[in-house]
Amino acid sequence: VTTFHQNILAFSPPPCYTETVNARRFAVRKRTRAKEKMEKEKITVAVTGVTGNMGQAVMEQLTASALRPTLRVLILPEDTKRAKKFRKRYAAQIRSGAIQIVYGNLADPAAVQKLIAGADYVVNLAAVIPPLSDQRPELAVECNEKGAQTLVAAIEAADPQPKLIHISTVALYGNRDEKHLWARVGDPLLVSPYDVYSATKLRGELCVLESGIRNWAVLRQSAMLHKNMLADNLKDGLMFHTCFNAPLEWVTAHDSGVLIAHILERDVSDPPEAKFWKRVFNIGAPAENRITGYETFNDGFRLIGGSGKDFFRPGYNAVRNFHGVWFADGHRLEELFAYQTQSAAHYWAEIKKAHGYYSLAKIVPKALIRKLVIEHLRKDANAPAYWKKHGDIGKLTAFFGGEKEYDALPARWEDFPLLCEGKGKNGAVDYNALRDIRNAVPIDCGFDADKADKDITIADLRATAKAHGGELVSETFAAGDLYTPVEWKTQDGDVFTARPYSVLRAGHWFNRTYKENVWEFDRLARKDGVYAQIWYDTHGRDERYVYSMSDDMRTKFESE
């Protein structure tokens, strides 16, 4: 049993964990301490992205928190519909001054300066996500990348500095399949080609990690179940990007909001200090929430009396180039903040209760629903069927391996291997064993990732660089000092400066995607042993493609 698996066994919650008695007692105790302390002092929390799905859940929790913080929120002036809804919901708090609204863009220095002035904490939830990031990639650049840079610069210049909680994304890990279903912070970050959302979030996250902010924490959000999920996924062809065998770990929006509230409450009442600040975490979910893409569709269609097989065909959805993992270290945040209260089953039960009319669809022929809803969405520009019809070879290659591979997908479910049914690429598999965290297969990043920070030496830095096909340029390193930047060199000879924490503990390694919308992992993986472990799970070693986007954000595709 490796140290990796010993750590999992030591810290993992039980398989059907929701919220233990001890966790509840812990949460109550922390809230009580926070309330007592907040009778003597007041904090201000600046929050971005409050009109989004996670943002709404965070606002619900913070406005009900024992902290009773002053909340200063940033809202886009052009987002009139959602801004009006927000003002109506929190009218009383706005009148009392408990909630203050700053209208502006996250990339606008003046608006951001006004937002964070005098704040004790900043919670950055703002993000342009798919499908909007696919339709308007320039907005993703402005918010996810430039917005993060603007926010970081403002906090760096503030005196005193507020503490920053930055929400990142599981999308940084890129595509995973049955060979490497599990990931942990520190795994390589191979953002999927053409996914401007993940590329801009990658750059935004690194900006935080390399910043001069004294207290920051980066939380990589997993797949999130929220009240608008069904409606949002029936607007364009994005649902067809979800691989049926993709590992998805579903946290609910409610629990995400609880997490943020508990972080602030504990930091006020009983600061976690070194256990939390200046670290990256995965936002994990209860074990029963780890399922596949197909099972997710199945759960949703069960509301109308059907199944995934009733409405989809194997060839409708991508077979690679998505994002999703099960978190081997998702329990770490739970141990600190006891936020996991909802299962996926609970979420679907709540959706059914709130939308009882969904059950009326049970009397409608399934073939008719498929034609009117699913087949209609396949005509959308964001759907594979559209790419095929219009000859978008770049996207067909990125998501399927090529046009021939797309055409060769089976028409019948009997001929398509579903992991959840015990069928893998090369034959039968034990799905329950794959879902068991004790069987997680760790990525070899070149050094012993289970070492304590204090035991990291220059040999570990050199080994990590070598595993990436590069080298450590700096000749000195104080053992355990993961936050003093050092120089590294990539396989292409590019020299870059980064903190050892960013590379060894957070998985960053410089490539062209960090500065432009170019994805060339086919080439990089041939010399990068860390990338190769993931990339070749779903890509051929003979593939020689470069995926990119032009200055006007049009997709490009060419051979090396």
Predicted feature locations:
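Conserved Rossmann-fold NAD(P)-dependent oxidoreductase catalytic core, especially the SDR/UDP-sugar
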Residues: 128, 149-196, 217
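NAD(P)-dependent short-chain dehydrogenase/reductase
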Residues: 209-262, 297-300
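NAD(P)H-binding glycine-rich loop region in Rossmannoid oxidoreductase-like domains
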Residues: 92-146
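Glycine-rich NAD(P)-binding loop of the Rossmann-fold in SDR/ketoreductase-type enzymes
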Residues: 107, 139-150, 195, 199-200, ...
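N-terminal Rossmann NAD(P)H-binding glycine-rich loop of SDR-like oxidoreductase domains
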Residues: 43-65
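Mid/C-terminal beta-alpha module of Rossmann-like enzyme folds, strongest
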Residues: 265-336, 340-350, 355-366, 371-434
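Functional cation/ligand-contacting sites centered on basic and imidazole/sulfhydryl donors
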Residues: 415-560
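Active-site Tyr-X1-5-Lys
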Residues: 191-217
